[in-house]
Amino acid sequence: MENTLPVKEEQKHVKISEFVLYLVAVFFYTNMTGMMGSYRNDYLVNVLQIPSTKLSLYNLLISVIPFVINFFIAMYIDGRKMGKAGKFRPLALIAAVPMGILLVLSFVTPKAFTGTILMIYLVTVAVAWSIASNFGGTTNMVAVVMTPNLKERDTVMSFRGIVSAVGNSAPLVIVLVIGIFAKDKGTRFIIGAALCSVVGIIAMLLGMKAVHERVAYTAEKRNPLVGFKDVLGNKYAWTIIISEFLKSFRGIATYMGVFMAGALLGDTDKFVLFGLPTGIGTAVGMLAINFLLKKFNSKVLYIASGIYSVIINIIAFIVGYTYFHNPSKVLQIIFIAFLFLIGLQFGASNLLPSMFQADVLEDIELKTGKRLDATFPFVIGIGTMISGTIASTLAPRILYDDPTTGWKSIIGYMPGLVDDTAQSLDSKVKLLFFYTVVHGIMMFLAGVPFFFYKLTGKTKEDIHNAVVEQRKKFEEG
Protein backbone atom coordinates (compact mmCIF):
# COMPACT_ATOMS: atom_id res chain seq x y z
CA MET A 1 0.00 0.00 0.00
CA GLU A 2 1.58 3.32 -1.02
CA ASN A 3 1.89 6.04 1.60
CA THR A 4 -0.67 8.83 1.39
CA LEU A 5 -1.33 11.79 3.61
CA PRO A 6 -4.60 11.02 5.46
CA VAL A 7 -7.39 13.49 4.81
CA LYS A 8 -10.40 13.63 7.12
CA GLU A 9 -13.85 13.50 5.55
CA GLU A 10 -15.76 16.19 7.47
CA GLN A 11 -18.63 16.98 5.10
CA LYS A 12 -22.06 15.68 6.10
CA HIS A 13 -24.01 13.89 3.38
CA VAL A 14 -27.20 12.37 4.82
CA LYS A 15 -30.33 14.54 4.60
CA ILE A 16 -32.80 14.60 7.50
CA SER A 17 -35.63 13.16 5.38
CA GLU A 18 -33.39 10.34 4.15
CA PHE A 19 -32.20 9.65 7.70
CA VAL A 20 -35.76 9.47 9.07
CA LEU A 21 -37.07 7.23 6.28
CA TYR A 22 -34.09 4.93 6.71
CA LEU A 23 -34.80 4.59 10.44
CA VAL A 24 -38.47 3.86 9.66
CA ALA A 25 -37.38 1.07 7.31
CA VAL A 26 -35.03 -0.34 9.96
CA PHE A 27 -37.74 -0.15 12.65
CA PHE A 28 -40.27 -2.16 10.69
CA TYR A 29 -37.67 -4.58 9.31
CA THR A 30 -36.72 -5.46 12.90
CA ASN A 31 -40.41 -5.44 13.79
CA MET A 32 -40.82 -8.37 11.40
CA THR A 33 -37.72 -10.21 12.63
CA GLY A 34 -38.78 -9.44 16.22
CA MET A 35 -42.18 -11.07 15.68
CA MET A 36 -40.40 -14.20 14.53
CA GLY A 37 -37.82 -14.11 17.31
CA SER A 38 -40.27 -13.40 20.13
CA TYR A 39 -43.09 -15.80 19.32
CA ARG A 40 -41.94 -18.54 16.94
CA ASN A 41 -40.73 -20.78 19.78
CA ASP A 42 -43.90 -20.11 21.78
CA TYR A 43 -45.95 -21.07 18.70
CA LEU A 44 -44.06 -24.33 18.19
CA VAL A 45 -44.12 -25.34 21.87
CA ASN A 46 -47.53 -24.17 23.11
CA VAL A 47 -49.67 -24.04 19.93
CA LEU A 48 -48.33 -26.88 17.78
CA GLN A 49 -46.90 -28.66 20.85
CA ILE A 50 -43.97 -30.14 18.95
CA PRO A 51 -42.09 -32.73 21.09
CA SER A 52 -38.80 -31.41 22.46
CA THR A 53 -36.65 -33.97 20.61
CA LYS A 54 -38.28 -33.10 17.27
CA LEU A 55 -37.96 -29.39 18.03
CA SER A 56 -34.25 -29.91 18.64
CA LEU A 57 -33.99 -31.56 15.21
CA TYR A 58 -35.96 -28.69 13.69
CA ASN A 59 -33.63 -26.12 15.25
CA LEU A 60 -30.60 -28.05 14.00
CA LEU A 61 -31.93 -28.17 10.42
CA ILE A 62 -32.93 -24.51 10.27
CA SER A 63 -29.47 -23.53 11.51
CA VAL A 64 -27.36 -25.71 9.22
CA ILE A 65 -29.34 -25.54 5.95
CA PRO A 66 -29.59 -21.71 5.80
CA PHE A 67 -25.93 -21.45 6.78
CA VAL A 68 -24.87 -23.47 3.73
CA ILE A 69 -27.14 -21.42 1.48
CA ASN A 70 -25.95 -18.15 3.02
CA PHE A 71 -22.38 -19.02 2.01
CA PHE A 72 -23.39 -18.48 -1.60
CA ILE A 73 -25.55 -15.46 -0.72
CA ALA A 74 -22.55 -13.76 0.93
CA MET A 75 -20.39 -14.37 -2.15
CA TYR A 76 -23.16 -13.05 -4.38
CA ILE A 77 -23.69 -9.86 -2.36
CA ASP A 78 -19.99 -9.00 -2.13
CA GLY A 79 -19.50 -9.88 -5.79
CA ARG A 80 -22.15 -7.39 -6.91
CA LYS A 81 -21.09 -4.22 -8.64
CA MET A 82 -22.21 -0.92 -7.15
CA GLY A 83 -24.64 0.35 -9.79
CA LYS A 84 -26.59 3.60 -9.83
CA ALA A 85 -29.08 2.16 -7.35
CA GLY A 86 -26.27 1.07 -5.04
CA LYS A 87 -25.12 -2.36 -3.93
CA PHE A 88 -27.45 -3.13 -1.03
CA ARG A 89 -30.61 -1.07 -1.60
CA PRO A 90 -31.91 -3.17 -4.54
CA LEU A 91 -31.57 -6.38 -2.52
CA ALA A 92 -33.50 -4.93 0.43
CA LEU A 93 -36.25 -3.76 -1.94
CA ILE A 94 -36.51 -7.22 -3.50
CA ALA A 95 -36.57 -8.97 -0.10
CA ALA A 96 -39.37 -6.89 1.46
CA VAL A 97 -42.41 -8.70 -0.01
CA PRO A 98 -41.08 -12.28 0.39
CA MET A 99 -40.19 -11.50 4.01
CA GLY A 100 -43.72 -10.33 4.72
CA ILE A 101 -45.35 -13.37 3.13
CA LEU A 102 -43.04 -15.86 4.84
CA LEU A 103 -43.53 -14.19 8.22
CA VAL A 104 -47.26 -14.91 8.03
CA LEU A 105 -46.68 -18.46 6.78
CA SER A 106 -44.42 -19.06 9.78
CA PHE A 107 -47.51 -18.85 12.01
CA VAL A 108 -49.94 -20.64 9.68
CA THR A 109 -49.85 -24.44 9.68
CA PRO A 110 -52.43 -26.53 7.76
CA LYS A 111 -54.22 -28.83 10.21
CA ALA A 112 -53.87 -31.75 7.80
CA PHE A 113 -50.07 -31.67 8.20
CA THR A 114 -48.74 -34.11 10.79
CA GLY A 115 -45.59 -36.12 11.42
CA THR A 116 -42.95 -35.97 8.70
CA ILE A 117 -45.08 -33.76 6.41
CA LEU A 118 -45.45 -31.22 9.21
CA MET A 119 -41.69 -31.20 9.86
CA ILE A 120 -40.92 -30.75 6.14
CA TYR A 121 -43.38 -27.84 5.95
CA LEU A 122 -42.01 -26.11 9.04
CA VAL A 123 -38.38 -26.50 7.96
CA THR A 124 -39.13 -25.35 4.39
CA VAL A 125 -40.86 -22.17 5.55
CA ALA A 126 -38.13 -21.47 8.12
CA VAL A 127 -35.34 -21.90 5.56
CA ALA A 128 -37.15 -19.69 3.04
CA TRP A 129 -37.63 -17.06 5.77
CA SER A 130 -33.93 -17.22 6.62
CA ILE A 131 -32.96 -16.63 2.98
CA ALA A 132 -35.39 -13.72 2.60
CA SER A 133 -34.36 -12.10 5.88
CA ASN A 134 -30.69 -12.55 4.95
CA PHE A 135 -31.25 -10.47 1.83
CA GLY A 136 -33.45 -8.14 3.88
CA GLY A 137 -30.51 -7.73 6.26
CA THR A 138 -28.90 -5.52 3.63
CA THR A 139 -31.20 -2.89 5.15
CA ASN A 140 -28.71 -2.80 8.03
CA MET A 141 -25.67 -2.88 5.74
CA VAL A 142 -26.81 0.32 4.04
CA ALA A 143 -25.92 2.28 7.20
CA VAL A 144 -22.22 1.57 6.69
CA VAL A 145 -22.16 3.02 3.16
CA MET A 146 -24.56 5.97 3.46
CA THR A 147 -21.70 8.38 4.19
CA PRO A 148 -17.89 8.44 4.04
CA ASN A 149 -17.83 10.71 7.11
CA LEU A 150 -16.72 8.58 10.10
CA LYS A 151 -18.65 10.53 12.76
CA GLU A 152 -21.77 10.70 10.61
CA ARG A 153 -21.49 6.97 9.91
CA ASP A 154 -21.25 6.17 13.62
CA THR A 155 -24.26 8.42 14.29
CA VAL A 156 -26.34 6.63 11.66
CA MET A 157 -25.28 3.26 13.06
CA SER A 158 -26.04 4.34 16.63
CA PHE A 159 -29.56 5.45 15.81
CA ARG A 160 -30.03 2.35 13.69
CA GLY A 161 -29.20 0.28 16.75
CA ILE A 162 -31.61 2.20 18.99
CA VAL A 163 -34.44 1.97 16.47
CA SER A 164 -33.72 -1.73 15.96
CA ALA A 165 -34.02 -2.39 19.69
CA VAL A 166 -37.39 -0.64 19.89
CA GLY A 167 -38.64 -2.25 16.67
CA ASN A 168 -37.65 -5.67 17.95
CA SER A 169 -39.84 -5.16 21.04
CA ALA A 170 -42.85 -3.71 19.20
CA PRO A 171 -44.46 -7.12 18.40
CA LEU A 172 -44.77 -7.75 22.14
CA VAL A 173 -47.18 -4.82 22.42
CA ILE A 174 -48.98 -5.76 19.21
CA VAL A 175 -49.69 -9.33 20.34
CA LEU A 176 -50.74 -8.16 23.82
CA VAL A 177 -53.28 -5.70 22.36
CA ILE A 178 -54.60 -8.33 19.93
CA GLY A 179 -55.12 -10.61 22.94
CA ILE A 180 -57.83 -8.25 24.20
CA PHE A 181 -60.24 -9.46 21.51
CA ALA A 182 -58.62 -12.68 20.23
CA LYS A 183 -58.41 -15.29 22.99
CA ASP A 184 -56.90 -18.10 20.91
CA LYS A 185 -53.09 -17.94 21.04
CA GLY A 186 -52.64 -19.23 17.48
CA THR A 187 -55.04 -16.59 16.14
CA ARG A 188 -53.18 -13.85 18.00
CA PHE A 189 -49.93 -14.89 16.37
CA ILE A 190 -51.43 -14.94 12.86
CA ILE A 191 -52.99 -11.48 13.23
CA GLY A 192 -49.79 -10.09 14.77
CA ALA A 193 -47.65 -11.53 11.98
CA ALA A 194 -50.02 -10.14 9.33
CA LEU A 195 -49.89 -6.62 10.80
CA CYS A 196 -46.09 -6.68 11.12
CA SER A 197 -45.88 -8.00 7.57
CA VAL A 198 -48.04 -5.39 5.84
CA VAL A 199 -46.51 -2.39 7.60
CA GLY A 200 -43.02 -3.87 7.30
CA ILE A 201 -43.26 -4.30 3.53
CA ILE A 202 -44.49 -0.73 3.01
CA ALA A 203 -41.84 0.78 5.33
CA MET A 204 -38.96 -1.15 3.77
CA LEU A 205 -40.01 -0.18 0.24
CA LEU A 206 -40.34 3.50 1.15
CA GLY A 207 -37.17 3.66 3.24
CA MET A 208 -34.91 1.80 0.83
CA LYS A 209 -36.23 3.88 -2.06
CA ALA A 210 -35.19 7.07 -0.23
CA VAL A 211 -31.64 6.24 0.89
CA HIS A 212 -28.41 6.65 -1.07
CA GLU A 213 -25.14 4.74 -0.94
CA ARG A 214 -22.21 7.15 -1.07
CA VAL A 215 -19.12 5.08 -0.29
CA ALA A 216 -17.12 4.35 -3.45
CA TYR A 217 -14.82 1.36 -3.81
CA THR A 218 -13.27 -0.71 -6.53
CA ALA A 219 -15.61 -2.57 -8.87
CA GLU A 220 -12.85 -4.89 -10.05
CA LYS A 221 -14.08 -8.49 -10.26
CA ARG A 222 -12.15 -10.89 -8.02
CA ASN A 223 -12.48 -14.49 -6.94
CA PRO A 224 -15.08 -14.20 -4.14
CA LEU A 225 -13.42 -17.03 -2.19
CA VAL A 226 -10.35 -14.82 -1.74
CA GLY A 227 -12.52 -12.55 0.41
CA PHE A 228 -12.86 -15.29 3.03
CA LYS A 229 -9.08 -15.60 3.16
CA ASP A 230 -8.77 -11.83 3.59
CA VAL A 231 -11.13 -11.90 6.57
CA LEU A 232 -9.49 -14.91 8.21
CA GLY A 233 -6.08 -13.31 7.75
CA ASN A 234 -7.08 -10.17 9.64
CA LYS A 235 -6.09 -10.22 13.33
CA TYR A 236 -8.79 -7.74 14.33
CA ALA A 237 -11.46 -9.86 12.66
CA TRP A 238 -10.57 -12.82 14.87
CA THR A 239 -11.38 -10.86 18.02
CA ILE A 240 -14.93 -10.34 16.77
CA ILE A 241 -15.26 -13.90 15.43
CA ILE A 242 -14.32 -15.42 18.81
CA SER A 243 -16.42 -12.92 20.78
CA GLU A 244 -19.56 -13.52 18.72
CA PHE A 245 -19.01 -17.29 18.91
CA LEU A 246 -19.08 -17.11 22.70
CA LYS A 247 -21.95 -14.62 22.79
CA SER A 248 -24.23 -16.84 20.72
CA PHE A 249 -24.38 -19.40 23.51
CA ARG A 250 -26.69 -16.90 25.23
CA GLY A 251 -29.29 -18.29 22.82
CA ILE A 252 -30.08 -20.84 25.53
CA ALA A 253 -30.98 -17.96 27.86
CA THR A 254 -33.01 -15.94 25.35
CA TYR A 255 -34.91 -19.09 24.34
CA MET A 256 -36.21 -19.32 27.91
CA GLY A 257 -37.49 -15.71 27.99
CA VAL A 258 -41.06 -16.19 26.80
CA PHE A 259 -41.50 -19.26 29.04
CA MET A 260 -39.99 -17.44 32.00
CA ALA A 261 -42.57 -14.69 31.48
CA GLY A 262 -45.34 -17.29 31.61
CA ALA A 263 -43.99 -18.82 34.81
CA LEU A 264 -43.76 -15.41 36.49
CA LEU A 265 -46.88 -13.71 35.10
CA GLY A 266 -49.20 -16.58 34.14
CA ASP A 267 -49.22 -16.30 30.33
CA THR A 268 -46.48 -16.23 27.70
CA ASP A 269 -48.38 -13.40 25.96
CA LYS A 270 -47.33 -11.20 28.89
CA PHE A 271 -43.75 -11.46 27.65
CA VAL A 272 -44.30 -7.81 26.74
CA LEU A 273 -43.69 -7.01 30.43
CA PHE A 274 -40.27 -8.60 29.99
CA GLY A 275 -39.55 -7.33 26.50
CA LEU A 276 -40.51 -3.68 26.99
CA PRO A 277 -38.34 -2.95 30.06
CA THR A 278 -35.47 -4.78 28.38
CA GLY A 279 -36.06 -2.94 25.09
CA ILE A 280 -36.28 0.45 26.80
CA GLY A 281 -33.15 -0.38 28.76
CA THR A 282 -31.41 -1.30 25.50
CA ALA A 283 -32.35 2.02 23.90
CA VAL A 284 -31.22 3.96 26.98
CA GLY A 285 -28.05 1.87 27.06
CA MET A 286 -27.26 2.81 23.47
CA LEU A 287 -27.73 6.49 24.24
CA ALA A 288 -25.46 6.07 27.25
CA ILE A 289 -22.85 4.31 25.11
CA ASN A 290 -22.92 7.18 22.62
CA PHE A 291 -22.22 9.59 25.47
CA LEU A 292 -19.54 7.39 27.06
CA LEU A 293 -17.74 6.97 23.72
CA LYS A 294 -16.70 10.61 24.09
CA LYS A 295 -14.79 9.68 27.24
CA PHE A 296 -13.80 6.03 26.78
CA ASN A 297 -12.93 3.86 23.78
CA SER A 298 -15.26 1.14 22.52
CA LYS A 299 -13.02 -1.69 23.71
CA VAL A 300 -13.12 -0.56 27.35
CA LEU A 301 -16.89 -0.07 27.25
CA TYR A 302 -17.51 -3.53 25.79
CA ILE A 303 -15.37 -5.27 28.41
CA ALA A 304 -17.02 -3.24 31.19
CA SER A 305 -20.49 -4.12 29.87
CA GLY A 306 -19.67 -7.83 30.16
CA ILE A 307 -18.64 -7.46 33.79
CA TYR A 308 -21.78 -5.41 34.47
CA SER A 309 -23.90 -8.11 32.82
CA VAL A 310 -22.69 -10.84 35.18
CA ILE A 311 -23.31 -8.70 38.26
CA ILE A 312 -26.78 -7.42 37.29
CA ASN A 313 -28.00 -10.85 36.15
CA ILE A 314 -26.90 -12.51 39.38
CA ILE A 315 -28.75 -9.85 41.39
CA ALA A 316 -31.83 -10.35 39.18
CA PHE A 317 -31.63 -14.09 39.85
CA ILE A 318 -31.55 -13.47 43.61
CA VAL A 319 -34.61 -11.19 43.36
CA GLY A 320 -36.49 -13.72 41.22
CA TYR A 321 -35.51 -16.62 43.47
CA THR A 322 -36.80 -14.72 46.50
CA TYR A 323 -40.05 -13.94 44.68
CA PHE A 324 -40.72 -17.56 43.72
CA HIS A 325 -40.23 -18.65 47.33
CA ASN A 326 -42.14 -15.69 48.83
CA PRO A 327 -44.45 -14.28 46.11
CA SER A 328 -45.38 -10.60 46.39
CA LYS A 329 -46.30 -7.85 43.95
CA VAL A 330 -43.41 -5.72 45.19
CA LEU A 331 -40.79 -8.37 44.36
CA GLN A 332 -42.47 -9.01 41.02
CA ILE A 333 -42.21 -5.32 40.13
CA ILE A 334 -38.59 -5.18 41.36
CA PHE A 335 -37.68 -8.15 39.15
CA ILE A 336 -39.26 -6.51 36.09
CA ALA A 337 -37.38 -3.31 36.95
CA PHE A 338 -34.16 -5.32 36.90
CA LEU A 339 -34.95 -6.30 33.32
CA PHE A 340 -34.50 -2.63 32.46
CA LEU A 341 -31.08 -2.71 34.13
CA ILE A 342 -30.22 -5.88 32.21
CA GLY A 343 -31.34 -4.12 29.03
CA LEU A 344 -28.74 -1.40 29.61
CA GLN A 345 -26.06 -3.98 28.85
CA PHE A 346 -27.79 -4.89 25.58
CA GLY A 347 -27.11 -1.31 24.55
CA ALA A 348 -23.42 -2.18 24.44
CA SER A 349 -23.76 -5.71 23.06
CA ASN A 350 -26.07 -4.58 20.24
CA LEU A 351 -24.32 -1.35 19.24
CA LEU A 352 -20.59 -1.81 19.74
CA PRO A 353 -20.11 -5.05 17.73
CA SER A 354 -21.58 -3.37 14.63
CA MET A 355 -19.10 -0.52 15.09
CA PHE A 356 -16.24 -2.98 15.56
CA GLN A 357 -17.27 -4.73 12.36
CA ALA A 358 -17.42 -1.45 10.43
CA ASP A 359 -13.90 -0.58 11.63
CA VAL A 360 -12.52 -4.01 10.71
CA LEU A 361 -14.15 -3.77 7.27
CA GLU A 362 -12.21 -0.56 6.70
CA ASP A 363 -8.97 -2.18 7.83
CA ILE A 364 -9.55 -5.03 5.36
CA GLU A 365 -10.52 -2.53 2.64
CA LEU A 366 -7.33 -0.54 3.19
CA LYS A 367 -5.18 -3.66 2.90
CA THR A 368 -7.00 -5.35 0.00
CA GLY A 369 -9.06 -2.68 -1.77
CA LYS A 370 -12.16 -4.84 -1.29
CA ARG A 371 -15.43 -4.15 0.53
CA LEU A 372 -16.49 -7.40 2.19
CA ASP A 373 -19.76 -6.26 3.78
CA ALA A 374 -21.42 -9.67 3.39
CA THR A 375 -18.37 -11.95 3.54
CA PHE A 376 -17.19 -10.69 6.93
CA PRO A 377 -20.56 -11.22 8.68
CA PHE A 378 -20.75 -14.65 7.03
CA VAL A 379 -17.35 -15.64 8.43
CA ILE A 380 -18.50 -14.41 11.83
CA GLY A 381 -21.60 -16.49 11.19
CA ILE A 382 -19.52 -19.66 10.89
CA GLY A 383 -18.77 -19.41 14.59
CA THR A 384 -22.20 -18.16 15.61
CA MET A 385 -23.83 -20.91 13.55
CA ILE A 386 -21.88 -23.54 15.48
CA SER A 387 -22.53 -22.06 18.92
CA GLY A 388 -26.04 -20.93 18.03
CA THR A 389 -26.94 -24.37 16.68
CA ILE A 390 -25.64 -26.02 19.83
CA ALA A 391 -27.68 -23.55 21.90
CA SER A 392 -30.90 -23.89 19.88
CA THR A 393 -30.60 -27.68 19.76
CA LEU A 394 -30.00 -28.00 23.50
CA ALA A 395 -32.58 -25.39 24.61
CA PRO A 396 -35.77 -27.44 23.96
CA ARG A 397 -34.19 -30.49 25.58
CA ILE A 398 -33.24 -28.41 28.59
CA LEU A 399 -36.72 -26.87 28.75
CA TYR A 400 -39.25 -29.72 28.61
CA ASP A 401 -39.66 -33.51 28.53
CA ASP A 402 -40.57 -35.64 25.52
CA PRO A 403 -42.81 -38.52 26.71
CA THR A 404 -42.70 -40.13 23.23
CA THR A 405 -38.97 -40.87 23.61
CA GLY A 406 -38.65 -40.85 27.39
CA TRP A 407 -36.44 -37.75 27.34
CA LYS A 408 -36.18 -36.03 30.73
CA SER A 409 -35.31 -32.34 30.65
CA ILE A 410 -33.40 -30.29 33.20
CA ILE A 411 -36.16 -27.71 33.78
CA GLY A 412 -39.27 -29.89 33.44
CA TYR A 413 -41.48 -27.16 31.90
CA MET A 414 -45.05 -28.33 31.17
CA PRO A 415 -46.38 -27.01 27.80
CA GLY A 416 -50.01 -26.05 27.19
CA LEU A 417 -51.01 -25.01 30.73
CA VAL A 418 -53.83 -22.47 30.95
CA ASP A 419 -51.99 -20.74 33.81
CA ASP A 420 -48.22 -21.03 33.54
CA THR A 421 -47.73 -20.04 37.17
CA ALA A 422 -48.80 -23.64 37.85
CA GLN A 423 -45.31 -24.74 36.80
CA SER A 424 -43.43 -26.38 39.68
CA LEU A 425 -41.21 -24.26 41.93
CA ASP A 426 -38.17 -26.25 40.83
CA SER A 427 -38.98 -25.57 37.16
CA LYS A 428 -39.43 -21.85 37.81
CA VAL A 429 -36.09 -21.51 39.61
CA LYS A 430 -34.23 -23.41 36.88
CA LEU A 431 -35.91 -21.30 34.19
CA LEU A 432 -34.81 -18.22 36.10
CA PHE A 433 -31.22 -19.47 36.35
CA PHE A 434 -30.91 -20.07 32.61
CA TYR A 435 -32.63 -16.78 31.76
CA THR A 436 -30.40 -14.65 33.99
CA VAL A 437 -27.15 -16.20 35.22
CA VAL A 438 -26.32 -18.13 32.03
CA HIS A 439 -26.94 -14.99 30.00
CA GLY A 440 -24.65 -12.92 32.22
CA ILE A 441 -21.83 -15.45 32.00
CA MET A 442 -22.01 -15.59 28.20
CA MET A 443 -21.90 -11.80 27.90
CA PHE A 444 -18.87 -11.64 30.18
CA LEU A 445 -17.06 -14.26 28.10
CA ALA A 446 -17.92 -12.33 24.92
CA GLY A 447 -15.93 -9.39 26.25
CA VAL A 448 -12.78 -11.36 27.12
CA PRO A 449 -11.30 -11.46 23.55
CA PHE A 450 -11.41 -7.65 23.45
CA PHE A 451 -8.57 -7.47 25.97
CA PHE A 452 -6.39 -8.13 22.89
CA TYR A 453 -8.19 -5.75 20.48
CA LYS A 454 -6.16 -2.72 19.34
CA LEU A 455 -8.28 -1.13 16.58
CA THR A 456 -9.37 1.89 18.63
CA GLY A 457 -8.54 5.57 19.07
CA LYS A 458 -5.84 7.00 16.80
CA THR A 459 -5.25 3.67 15.03
CA LYS A 460 -8.90 3.56 14.01
CA GLU A 461 -8.88 7.19 12.81
CA ASP A 462 -5.67 6.76 10.80
CA ILE A 463 -7.07 3.72 9.01
CA HIS A 464 -10.34 5.50 8.24
CA ASN A 465 -8.58 8.56 6.82
CA ALA A 466 -6.34 6.41 4.65
CA VAL A 467 -9.39 4.53 3.36
CA VAL A 468 -11.07 7.83 2.45
CA GLU A 469 -8.03 8.71 0.33
CA GLN A 470 -8.10 5.29 -1.30
CA ARG A 471 -11.79 5.64 -2.19
CA LYS A 472 -11.13 9.01 -3.80
CA LYS A 473 -8.67 7.31 -6.13
CA PHE A 474 -11.33 4.77 -7.11
CA GLU A 475 -13.79 7.61 -7.79
CA GLU A 476 -11.24 9.47 -9.90
CA GLY A 477 -10.24 6.29 -11.73
List each language-model region with its residue ranges:
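Membrane-embedded alpha-helical bundles of multi-pass transporters/translocases
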Residues: 2-477
